C-alpha cells in the first residue's frame, strides 16, 4: 500500500499577521464552516488555539446577526 504525502497544516492567520478575526468578513468565515454549518475543528484546519477561539466567536456572532446560516437548509 502506498503512503500518501500529507500536506503540512499551518495557521493562515499567523502567516498573514491577522490581529483579530472580524465577524463581518463572511468570505473568510465560510472557509471554516462545513456544508451543514458546523465549525471545522483546528486539528483539521491547522489553526492555532488563539485564532480558533476568535474564529468560533466570530462565526457565532455572524450567525446571530443572520450573516451566516446556522444550518445549510431548513426542510
Swiss-Prot record:
Keywords on record: Ribonucleoprotein, Ribosomal protein, RNA-binding, rRNA-binding
PROSITE patterns: RIBOSOMAL_S18 (PS00057)
Example GO BP: translation
Pfam families: Ribosomal_S18
Example of a GO cellular component annotation carried by this entry: cytosolic small ribosomal subunit
GO MF entries: small ribosomal subunit rRNA binding; structural constituent of ribosome
Gene3D superfamilies per record: Ribosomal protein S18 (4.10.640.10)
Task of the protein: Binds as a heterodimer with protein bS6 to the central domain of the 16S rRNA, where it helps stabilize the platform of the 30S subunit.
Binding partners and assembly: Part of the 30S ribosomal subunit. Forms a tight heterodimer with protein bS6.
PANTHER family, A to Z: 30S RIBOSOMAL PROTEIN S18, SMALL RIBOSOMAL SUBUNIT PROTEIN BS18M
Family of the protein in this entry: Belongs to the bacterial ribosomal protein bS18 family.
Protein name: Small ribosomal subunit protein bS18
Source species: Sodalis glossinidius (strain morsitans)
Amino acid at each position: 500500500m502506498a503512503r500518501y504525502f500529507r500536506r503540512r497544516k499551518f495557521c493562515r492567520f499567523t502567516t498573514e499577521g491577522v490581529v483579530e478575526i472580524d465577524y463581518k468578513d463572511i468570505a473568510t468565515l465560510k472557509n471554516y464552516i462545513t456544508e451543514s454549518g458546523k465549525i471545522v475543528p483546528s486539528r483539521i484546519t491547522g489553526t492555532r488555539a488563539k485564532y480558533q477561539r476568535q474564529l468560533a466567536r466570530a462565526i457565532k456572532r455572524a450567525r446571530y446577526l443572520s450573516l451566516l446560516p446556522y444550518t445549510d437548509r431548513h426542510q
